[in-house]
């Protein structure tokens, strides 16, 4: 088994960063080996987007995914950037491939799913969470995940795990869900092949996304604002 550990990174918060984070990761890998736990750990960060990120990115001590050109980014849910495609473009110009984390969680994207289409055409990779896919975040979010998958707008499924109890991994259930609902080929691409491309720092070959007939799930506004 292989895991890319992606602890949060915010330039203004006191998370573990840089070499200090790398030392913790190396110690964790050592403990796994000493306890005969056959899991390979790779280091990355989930970078919290701030509006000066592009300007300061060369000064920040975050980790791309396994030292690749792929950079995992999440966005503020209540202050979602209006110019997301421009952000993707600017990151590409700086040599990164942005992986947009858990896009199914953003109300703005539910209101206008074609944002995802435009971002993919600009060069972004799209990730959703396993828990969302199998309905643990509600049927409407699950439905939206399926809409994206059916339109070739998802490239990765990840855990968003924060522990063994809170936000625990649900990858096996999610893989089986995709295999049964769609196909083994699609499941392998979303869970294995595309992730391996990131580990190997290779290009992810994506299917052409469908722009038309994207449904808007306005019901989510009521869910998130309760």
Question: Where are the model-predicted features located?
Answer:
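Short beta-strand segments at enzyme active-site cores
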Residues: 1-8, 41-44
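Short acidic/histidine-rich active-site segments
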Residues: 6-8, 153-169
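Active-site environment of divalent metal-dependent phosphoester hydrolases
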Residues: 10-13, 48-50, 105-109, 133-136, ...
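Extended substrate/RNA-proximal surfaces in nucleic-acid metabolism proteins
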Residues: 14-127, 205-226
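Short acidic, glycine/proline-enriched helix-loop-strand junctions
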Residues: 15-19, 36-40, 166-193
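Histidine/acidic-residue-rich catalytic or RNA/ligand-binding cores of hydrolases
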Residues: 110-117, 137-146, 150-151, 164-176, ...
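Conserved short secondary-structure transition element at the edge of the structured enzyme core
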Residues: 128, 145-159
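Mid-to-C-terminal alpha-helical segments outside catalytic/metal-binding sites
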Residues: 176-226
């Amino acid at each position: 088994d292989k895991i890319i550990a992606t602890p949060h990174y915010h330039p203004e918060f006191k998370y573990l960063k840089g070499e200090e984070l790398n030392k913790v990761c190396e110690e964790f890998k050592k403990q796994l080996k000493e306890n005969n736990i056959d899991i390979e750990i790779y280091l990355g960060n989930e970078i919290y987007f701030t509006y000066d990120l592009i300007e300061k990115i060369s000064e920040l001590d975050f980790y791309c995914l396994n030292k690749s050109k792929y950079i995992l980014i999440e966005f503020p849910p209540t202050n979602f950037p209006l110019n997301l495609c421009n952000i993707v473009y600017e990151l590409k110009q700086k040599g990164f491939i942005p992986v947009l984390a858990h896009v199914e969680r953003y109300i703005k994207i539910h209101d206008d799913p074609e944002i995802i289409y435009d971002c993919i055409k600009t060069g972004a990779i799209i990730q959703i969470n396993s828990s969302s896919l199998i309905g643990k975040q509600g049927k409407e979010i699950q439905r939206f995940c399926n809409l994206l998958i059916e339109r070739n707008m998802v490239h990765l499924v990840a855990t968003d795990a924060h522990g063994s109890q809170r936000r625990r991994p649900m990858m096996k259930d999610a893989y089986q869900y995709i295999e049964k609902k769609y196909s083994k080929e699609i499941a392998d691409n979303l869970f294995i092949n595309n992730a391996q491309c990131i580990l190997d720092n290779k290009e992810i070959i994506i299917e052409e996304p469908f722009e038309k007939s994207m449904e808007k799930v306005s019901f989510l506004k009521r869910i998130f604002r309760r």
